[in-house]
Amino acid sequence: MPHPSAPDPDPAPGLVTIGKAAKKASLGGRTQVIVPVSGDAAALSGQVEALASCRADIVEWRADTFLSSLVGAHFVSASDVEEDLARMARYVADSSPLPVLATIRTSVEGGEAYLDDEEYCALVRRLASFAGGVDVEISRDGSSALIDEVHEAGAIVVASFHDFEGTPGDEQLAEVLAAMNYAGADVLKFACMANSATDAARVLAAQAWAHEAYDRPVIGIAMGSSGAPTRLVGSALGSAATFATLPGWEGSAPGQFTVEQVRAVLDIVEASED
């Protein structure tokens, strides 16, 4: 029997469906708005309630921030937190009106989870039992096998790469995207800190190149004040999604706009394309 959040069969070429039935969205066509929720159980409850009135398409649960609320900034064993994580994953999946992308962002890539490769893979596998999509950090040892295991659980995979210090060279970005594609990820995501307008332009160029090179959705983001415009104009270069904040709540990365701000710009861009 398929997982209740498994993607619909045989999506159109280049399209990936996250979720199912009333809770689903397609990546690879119209740019989707992803809104992160984070924090401890009380904060999550308030944010999940607010989802009903926002114009987002997908919710990203930053599970690493929940883990941090339990254990702080310490390396942990998966067995110590697995059941608490599963209970919260079930709550978010059941309560959210939107399809869920579950993410454990590790400290190595700017997140709050301190996990070695084995513990990271164990917890991501567990999340795949609840969420329609799961983020997999491509730089982790065992990421290719983990992608296969997430697929077997019925969830889609957003392979990700983050650099909070700067924007890598064009060749390195191309190698990272090629590795994601080779590993069989459904969606390719990269986010880099833009320390200049030139960095932001290179991220957009990499986004446009990958969109043409690979028959799967690509999400390219330049973080920081110099990169903020890429969150709004990336749709014109084939970006499958952009991340935005719930009004009154903090974002998950530097440079994010609110859902309403992003939606207003996307509406204008899409109207100009009609």
Q: Which sequence ranges carry the predicted segments?
A:
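N-terminal amphipathic alpha-helix/helix-capping segment at the start of soluble metabolic enzymes
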Residues: 1-46, 271-274
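C-terminal alpha-helical cap/extension of soluble enzyme domains
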Residues: 5-12, 208-274
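Acidic (Asp/Glu)-rich catalytic clusters
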Residues: 25-27, 48-55, 81-97, 123-129, ...
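Catalytic beta/alpha-barrel core
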Residues: 36, 58-66, 103-105, 130-143, ...
